[in-house]
Amino acid sequence: MFAQRKALENSEKSLSEFIPYSAVIAPGVVICREGDLVATVKISGKVFEAVSNDALQRDAERQNNFLKVMASASSTDEMSLKVHRIRRVVHDELSVPDENLSSRFVRDFVRAYNSEISENNLMATELYVSLVSHKATALKRDKYKESEIREELKERLEVFGKVFDQLVSSLRDYEPAVLGEYSDEQGIIFSHQLSFYNYLLTGQWQKVRVPFMPLNEALGNVQVFGGADTLEFQTALGKSYVQSIELKDYPMATYSRLLDGLLYNTNFDQSSYPFIETQTFTALSKNKGLKALKLQQNQLRSAQDDAVSQMQLLSLARDMVANGQIVIGDYSYSLLVFGSEDTVVAHANDSVKKLQDAGFLPIKSTLALVTSYLHQLPGRKDRSRVAKISSMNFAHLASFHNFPCGKRDRNPWGEAVALMKMPSDQPYYFNFHYTDPEKDSLGDVPLGNTAILGASGAGKTVLLNFLLCSAQKYRDKDHQLSVILFDKDKGAELAIKAMGGGYLAIENGKPSGINPFQLEPTTENIQFLIGWTKRLIGRDGLQITPLDEQRIATAVETVMSMPAKYRRLAVLPQSLQTGDRVEDAQNSLTMRLSKWIETGPLAWAFDNEINTLDLNEFPNFGIDGTDFLENEDVRGPITEILLYLIETQVMKDKRRTIIVMDEFWKYLSDPATAQFAFDKLKTIRKQNGIFVFASQSPEDVLKSERGSAFVDNTATKIYLPNPYANEKDYTEGFKCTKDEFSIIKSLDTQSRLMLIKQGPVSVMIRLDLGNFKRALKIFSGTAGTTKFGEKLFSLVGDDPEVWIPYFFGDKPLPTSEKEEA
């Protein structure tokens, strides 16, 4: 590919001859050797995936307004705007849970997941906007005095500064950060601006000092060799190869999403790749713009071209220029695609296809290869394939679109829960809490409640178990973490037990192990039991009189004064009066309680000899409600006890707590439970807790009396695919935009994609655990694997260090058990 390399080496010109920069002349301003002024601002960009076209067009119109301002300032110096969109490879790996406070399964999975995420190309998209003031004319011959030169430069800097300030102001919604100078601990002055320009030359980020020599001699620590259509970069860190793509022709119309396809990896046979996209717009005066449009019209007429629609568009453009709605400018585009010697061609071909799909006519640079490379530098005037376009066209093409990245550190509980990938291969740092990305929120107690909605088969169970597994790192030497999960269909039993947790499946007719009267006889517990017993007896709909309430209170206090081993629900009637009349006896508290005790049909629920439910026994505790959720008699009383135990056993010391309710709307069917959950939803943050509720349908949530309150008190909403989604439920109930709803409804349930929304910002995420077959077998919690796991638990116990090797076949099982697997 580089047959001419020897000749190139022999006749090699110093790269410094092509670098336009001379010196840092003012904070954040570089002057070029020909007198041009350059300043650059980095912006975070703006989300666009679930944003309406109307909103994106309004953004483009604001950008168009600045370009008109820039054109009006070009009466003395010609102004250019150069926009860079950089895609580069990044690596990151989050921490693994504490070895002494988590199970081996958790640590092995999190470590392997973090490693895969880091090793497979993660991409960062960075946006830079540079303003260039091209010196219109050389100094007059009689202006040789240094004072006169300084005065002219001062005037130019003043005008340039005002326009640049307007640029930064126009970018305020994009979180602008002006690139300037900074000092290290030794007082050495470095420059972010020079680091950026040097990156454009070398393809590598490095700190650059403000030198005491001309900038063109200090920058560009790279050797560049050119082939027919490829450049080779050699730096101290290695080699890279680059191909450049230009545009020969453009679509008839532009719109804001036109070039966004370059950000997505649509070819799963190859990894995402780095590139530097450069777009330059040099504003023309109104007269020059009108002349340029008239020239294009004349050329069409001379060619006897039948492009009537093009003529009409040009006429419309002339009217808009004349009315001051747009300006015309010289536009150029280059896309430098990076790769290894083996991959650069495939990467460039992929970009060519994406540009073709967007309606462009792209071409790889050959004769203009070096020009395209140098065109990246703000301040370089030479460029190939210059086209006349409008300021609105440029606003559409250089649209400043980007993706939110979440918040990696300084969250209320520290590091992000998990690093997840977007379809663009960019990292997203997921958190339950929603806090200002720029603020240190460590130790704060903001809202962290999270809703997860998705149709059956969309991956809700896997996502829940993945997040809980990842969250185990929040249990460390300085902090306790308790996870309480109200399960459905035992979907999380394997995951909870693999995390070293406990699991209680409450099944109709089988002793639940719950005996609330064996709680400690504190005043708080006794008062709860009085109220709970009153509600339990009153579930038959008959009136509880003030005298009944007094009798219940006395009976509960009497039972709670006994030794723990004697305390149970069946003892309560001994302290309840039945009345003298037959009618009184038939409707007595004792009779109404009879179905809940001894041989009564519901005695299995609470009349247990020993209480085996202790939420502090395990750091992770799962409770399966599949059976009792369908049983209206016991659903409310059981849930009320469970929530009370969470309040008193787990959350009282304000430890970090995550409460999860799968198909939680069923728990809300009982009014008392709904009230408790509603109160907890509003106050849980003050106790350092998070409520996570999941459901297959928003309709189930919203039909609850307090459904809208649950929506309003969630910081994070995760929407998995739902092809049966109802627009009213999502847009009115959960306050999704129509564009967000459209995405949720259109996603394939097998895509492993989801939409995560925090505040006004939503982002598409893909959670693909296809390379983690073992973890998926546990996270998915299918009926077959759960049944097999339960057989293992009965044989070898619940210790994950023991049962997991059998579960995965690392240890041989008896033949009968092996067949079950």
Task: For the regions a language model picked out, list residue spans one by one.
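Structural recognition of the conserved hydrophobic beta-strand(s) that form the central parallel beta-sheet
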Residues: I484-F486, I658-V660, I684, I690-Q696, ...
